Amino acid sequence: MAASGLRQAAVAASTSVKPIFSRDMNEAKRRVRELYRAWYREVPNTVHLFQLDISVKQGRDKVREMFKKNAHITDPRVVDLLVIKGKMELEETIKVWKQRTHVMRFFHETEAPRPKDFLSKFYVGHDP
């Protein structure tokens, strides 16, 4: 009897999960596009304001890379959470709450994925 009550509660909880902002994936994608455009427009100001040693094109390429890194996500709640974090980062950058080193951390060389199988780890020199 108690198990069926727990099962019903779990089913009710899973069906009543409310979205953070977006009702569906289309609305979440719209929010992502808005954030992408805001970042894309802000790159020239950021490069000039922080006197970065990169070009505007390199900055925009990095923005594109950061957005494409999460392109596989299909849950609107997760997308909304990432959009919220992106807006916070954008606000911190615009209002110069960051220092130059904080901004330049985004421009480290892209790391190659670590090997997963034994032989690849052995050849590279990582512990198995």
Curated annotation (Swiss-Prot):
The modification N-acetylalanine is found at A2. InterPro entries: Complex1_LYR_NDUFA6_LYRM6 (IPR045299), NADH_Ub_cplx-1_asu_su-6 (IPR016488). This is NADH dehydrogenase [ubiquinone] 1 alpha subcomplex subunit 6. PANTHER family: NADH DEHYDROGENASE [UBIQUINONE] 1 ALPHA SUBCOMPLEX SUBUNIT 6 (PTHR12964:SF0), NADH-UBIQUINONE OXIDOREDUCTASE B14 SUBUNIT (PTHR12964). It holds the Pfam family Complex1_LYR_2. Keywords: Acetylation, Electron transport, Membrane, Mitochondrion, Mitochondrion inner membrane, Respiratory chain, Transport. It comes from the Eukaryota. Belongs to the complex I LYR family. The keyword Ribonucleoprotein does not apply. It is found in: Mitochondrion inner membrane. The keyword Nuclease does not apply.
